[in-house]
């Protein structure tokens, strides 16, 4: 279906963006551009990456946005893990984490998503299951369990907890690998000024707001903290699609704070936030760039 969508988007696509949707969909692109669907999803491109033979393996849970819109983020993660002597496995059976279904009250659908992902992610003997999307990380680590508990599906809880014990967010894992001496940063780097946006799930549920900042600082970036760095960008998954009239002013406040920081690059750990903020800045013809932390670190880390 997404391959068909890639072809169908062509009349609306300009570069990496869809800037205008027609008719009843126009509200979605009135205040921000949307990312174009990638020509090839990560689940395909990752097969073309020549990974070194490694004793240790991790499973990468991509999530929908990285898989189908931003495969370059996943490719950057593979590059970093390989430098640490870790092979990245992409379990083919992974699907949506179920967060949109759960937040819409469709718990039965969310439970099916959870079971599908548990089966896929526990099929390989891996040290960690890593995600570069905080919303997905929260789903895998916490919400699969709470969904099964809410539905009384107690038989599914042991494997959900087994998965939760392996789940870790990208920045926390990289920080751990650096602290263990398995990765190191290039010396003497002065990479300029950036600003950092805290995704809601990363800071408030995973409590991992300092790890990315520490990594970016170690890499050689000067972080110009924006005002209200931890205020929501207005994305909120399907929230921004269903309630654009509320999402738009929240995004505008974030964009003002980014511009006022004086940085020409805004970095964040959430592909959903990248989609929202990059799309908003593009709509305003801003020269400020937006990237995921994984992309900023991929070329600055070396094997120890």
What are these regions (language model features)?
Residues 1-304:
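Iron-sulfur cluster-binding electron-transfer modules in prokaryotic oxidoreductases
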